[in-house]
């Protein structure tokens, strides 16, 4: 959002509590076990009052380990790739605004981590560890 400050793009960050109130369970369910709560970024660029509004939506999963169903080690290399759609939407809107293109675009980026934090669930680390008693 820092780069958008130098443009006419209006940015709105929808936080976890509002996402819950809106019934956005798909997003909040994926991200609720992470230390960083899910959110959604809405960007509005208005370059022409007469033009229709085009919508762009891009997935912004910033870290996808697979949650409780962990991915195999070999596929962990691409865990940041699930944010590529969101990055493309943000870049497109920035480019449109920076070049003052005569269009109207709204971009939506639902963002979360699909990663289990140490404090997920009961908040106890030993919930995820098995112990062998001698």
Predicted regions located by residue number:
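A generic structural signal for tightly packed, nonpolar segments enriched in small/aliphatic residues
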Residues: 1-134
